[in-house]
Swiss-Prot record:
Keywords annotated in UniProt: ATP-binding, Cell cycle, Cell division, Cell shape, Cell wall biogenesis/degradation, Cytoplasm, Ligase, Nucleotide-binding, Peptidoglycan synthesis
Sites where the protein binds ATP: 112-118
Annotated GO MF terms: ATP binding; UDP-N-acetylmuramate-L-alanine ligase activity
Entry EC number(s): 6.3.2.8
Coiled coil stretches, renumbered: none
Similarity field: Belongs to the MurCDEF family.
Main location: cytoplasm
Pathway entry: Cell wall biogenesis; peptidoglycan biosynthesis
Species of provenance: Herminiimonas arsenicoxydans
Top-rank lineage group of the source organism: Bacteria
HAMAP family on file: MurC
Protein name, UniProt field: UDP-N-acetylmuramate--L-alanine ligase
Catalysed transformations (reactions): UDP-N-acetyl-alpha-D-muramate + L-alanine + ATP = UDP-N-acetyl-alpha-D-muramoyl-L-alanine + ADP + phosphate + H(+)
Length: 469
């Protein structure tokens, strides 16, 4: 019956997860349309590929749709959703459409609170180098492919599995990865960490009897749930009991060198073209899957050496020049942009920057994401943000939430100041962030812009300001 569905409409098509699925379906021969509130690189790419994208939401946008796909960000009173209900057009949540794609291939699903996008990208890159030509759907731009999705001719599909709304429980993969489990998106789990842990256990139960759960043994919560998992397990990480174990890891000229040891295999020397110990862990997950699927170590080594990363995951913009102002001489600073918005991710990126740029002053421009996350992880943010040398703190990016008393940027800045390890500069309006950075930066600094909200536009503004120097 699926042949009767020809026209698929995406409500919120510009989102990272939505646009990737839309691109794969477009390449499968479906007619794709979609709507979003604004244009971005993803919508422009889809238009170039043949999709019809409309700015703004209206009932007439779904006039020819046989089905519509929605993300969790789309409200039930959206005019396109309302019109679809009235016309009895099937409304498919994004995760369910991803599950349908996974039925067409053998699925490899990457789950975990942190590291999903990079790990998914590493797995896709290694399998591609190994000749398996996978389909992939990633929550960020895979730089080497210039896209966040690709329809491959091979039998595997590699995709992120989203725990934020528990939608990963819709997937039926043959291989799963769990990178780590931390408290985030706790409203989905009634603020009960035990329920979050149980959801990951149930995720592994989606595997067939011959499926494999690839688990990071470095994570204490992953170790805690392992006795509840009744599937084949491969472990990875730095832990001495990990089956795929990284040893002798060190940062060299902005990338990581390490050795992988595993019973039945010769030690493998790896040069990973990404900084940070957390990326060594992510690479070990890719190595475990590559070996499970018969990819040669030589192909794996080549893919990891040539891996160019993912958009907004420690993206390096090179050196940015600035002019002399008053008593400050002209100079330049290294600019890095990152999507991290959880204290664990922030700590990992700061650590990676210390390794990639030893001895240089670290300036962090951070935009908290969501009032609920800022409230729930307030003390963790104070602890982590205090480890930078200079902090520019933006107001919280609401992401549709209403403000919460004492969970705003100004309160967080005050708490950091009281803690006494860093004296933050509070930047109330994100449009002022580029100029603020240019005013305080010194020659030789490393500037990291970080967050999941509108701070993503700051690097481009800094580059524009450099061009005017």
């Amino acid at each position: 019956m699926k042949h009767k569905v020809k026209n698929i409409h995406f409500v919120g098509i510009g989102g990272s997860g939505m646009s990737g699925i839309a691109e794969v379906l477009l390449n499968l021969g479906y007619t794709i349309s979609g709507s979003d509130l604004g244009s971005n690189a993803a919508t422009r790419r889809l238009v170039e590929l043949g999709a019809k994208v409309t700015l703004g939401h209206a009932a007439e946008n779904i006039a020819s749709a046989d089905a519509i796909v929605t993300s969790t960000a789309v409200q039930q009173d959206n005019p396109e959703v309302v019109a679809a209900r009235e016309k009895h057009i099937p409304i498919v949540p994004r995760a369910m459409m991803l599950a349908e794609l996974m039925r067409l291939r053998r699925g490899i699903a990457i789950a975990g609170t942190h590291g999903k996008t990079t790990t998914t990208s590493l797995v896709a890159s290694v399998l591609a180098e190994g000749g398996l030509d996978p389909t992939f759907v990633i929550g960020g731009l895979l730089n080497s492919a210039g896209a966040n999705a690709k329809l491959g001719a091979g039998e595997f599909i590699v995709a992120e599995a989203d725990e934020s709304d528990a939608s990963f429980l819709n997937l039926s993969p043959v291989i799963e990865v769990i990178t780590n489990i931390d408290a985030d998106h706790m409203e989905t789990y009634e603020h009960d960490f035990e329920k979050l842990k149980q959801a990951f256990v149930e995720f592994t139960q989606r595997l067939p009897f011959y499926g494999v759960a690839v688990l990071c043994l470095d994570d204490a919560t992953v170790r805690e749930i392992m006795p509840r998992i009744s599937k084949l397990i491969t472990t990875y990480g730095f832990h001495e009991d990990a089956m795929v174990r990284a040893v002798d890891a060190k940062a060299v000229d902005g990338h990581m060198q390490f050795t992988v040891i595993q019973d039945g295999y010769a030690p493998m020397q790896v040069s990973l073209n990404q900084p940070g110990m957390h990326n060594v862990q992510n690479a070990c997950a890719a190595i475990a899957i590559a070996r499970e699927l018969g990819v040669s170590d030589h192909a794996t080594q080549k893919a990891l050496t040539e891996f160019t990363g993912v958009g907004r995951r420690f993206t390096r913009y090179g050196e940015i020049s600035f002019s002399a102002v008053n008593d400050k001489p002209a100079g330049s600073f290294a600019l890095v942009d990152d999507y991290g918005h959880h204290p664990v991710e922030t700590a990992a990126t700061i650590s990676a920057a210390r390794g990639a740029y030893p001895g240089r002053r670290l300036v962090l421009a951070f935009q908290p994401h969501r009032y609920t996350r800022t409230r729930d992880l307030f003390e963790d943010f104070v602890k982590v943000l205090s480890t930078t040398d200079m902090l520019l703190l933006a107001e919280v990016y609401a992401a549709g939430e209403q403000p919460i008393v004492a969970a705003d940027g100004r309160t967080l800045a005050h708490a950091l100041r009281v803690a006494g390890k860093v004296d933050p500069v509070f930047v109330e309006h994100i449009v002022d962030m580029p100029a603020t950075i240019m005013n305080i930066v010194r020659d030789g600094d490393v500037v990291i812009t970080m967050g999941a909200g509108s701070i993503s536009g700051v690097p481009a503004k800094l580059k524009q300001m450099q061009d005017q120097v």
